A protein has these predicted regions:
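Hydrophobic, Leu/Ile/Phe/Ala-enriched alpha-helical segments that form helix-helix packing faces
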Residues: 15, 60-63, 240
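Catalytic metal-binding acidic patch
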Residues: 27-62, 77, 81-93
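Conserved nucleotidyltransferase catalytic core and NTase-mimicking acidic/glycine-rich helix/loop elements
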Residues: 131-248
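Conserved NTP/Mg2+-binding pocket subregion across the NTase superfamily
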Residues: 61-173
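Helical scaffold of the NTase/Pol beta-like nucleotidyltransferase catalytic core
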Residues: 1-25
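Short aromatic-enriched loop/helix-cap "lid" or pocket-rim segments at secondary-structure transitions
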Residues: 37-38, 101-104, 210
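A generic local structural motif
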Residues: 9-13, 29-31, 75
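Short, flexible, glycine/charge-rich loop motifs used to bind or transfer phosphoryl groups or to couple energy/partner
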Residues: 14-15, 31-34, 178
Length: 248
């Protein structure tokens, strides 16, 4: 891990002292070592019970602080702060909720929730992956391994969703409706990417570079508006190894 710049270290300590806070962690690309020189710093603020965003605003740092739940069910709020020349993203995490989702994942169960910024939605085991890959700075958080039951259950479910998406891609292609067709193709590709990652017992934190991590880079070029839509659907389905679901 790269050493924290002093302003980021100071902010982490301030967040850890807020009422309700139980831990502050370094997350994102800085934690996993995949960052660029210009990458932001991501801090996860884990709390139990409740957290008052006004306490974060009262720290006085320039930027935006959301309300709880304002960003969606998985990313349930946070802040974009500027500390001099350093950009910091703070993500609020209800540890009780995260641990409940983690317990479900241990039994191979999960939901896929609509989440801003995600094409296929975010699986409820995603926050467990954040715990597994983060770097704790203050306090303690669980550090789960990828559950074998999840590795057994998730791939089939994701591929089933891909098959349904390809069915609808075919329907949109038949109607020469390019935008929803492309959307369904992207949905199918990302679902198969999730399936592959689960088979490898690897956590997924978001959809950034997920297609490449899953070894599906070649599929990107198949979603091409210059070819006919039916041909694009057939090419993507073949590349994914998934047959579009037949409605009858």
């Amino acid at each position: 891990m790269t050493a924290l710049p002093p302003p980021v270290a100071d902010l982490a300590a301030q967040l850890a002292a807020l009422p309700g806070a139980v831990a502050v962690v370094l997350g994102g690309s800085r934690a996993t070592g995949t960052h660029r020189r210009d990458s932001d710093w991501d801090l996860g603020l884990y709390y139990r019970g409740t957290l008052d965003p006004e306490d974060v605003r009262a720290l006085g740092h320039p930027g935006f602080v959301s309300g709880l739940g304002e960003w969606g069910p998985i990313v349930n709020g946070g802040a974009w702060l500027t500390l001099g020349d350093t950009e910091v993203d703070v993500l609020f995490r209800d540890l009780d909720t995260v641990e409940a989702w983690r317990a479900e994942a241990e039994h191979g169960r999960f939901a896929i929730l609509a989440q801003n910024g995600y094409v296929v939605g975010a699986p409820t085991y995603l926050p467990a992956g954040e715990l597994a890959l983060c770097v704790p700075l203050h306090g303690d958080v669980p550090r789960p391994e990828f559950p074998p039951a999840l590795a057994a259950s998730a791939p089939g479910r994701w591929r089933g969703q891909a098959a349904v998406a390809l069915l609808f891609a075919q329907m949109h292609a038949g109607a020469s409706d390019a935008v929803p067709c492309a959307g369904m193709l992207a949905h199918a590709v990302l679902c198969v990417a999730h399936a592959r990652m689960a088979e490898r017992h690897e956590w997924v934190l978001n959809e950034k570079r997920l297609v490449g991590r899953a070894g599906l880079e070649g599929v990107q070029n198949l979603i091409d508006a210059e070819t006919g839509l039916p041909e694009s659907v057939a090419a993507v389905a073949a590349a994914l190894g998934v047959e579009p679901l037949a409605p009858r």
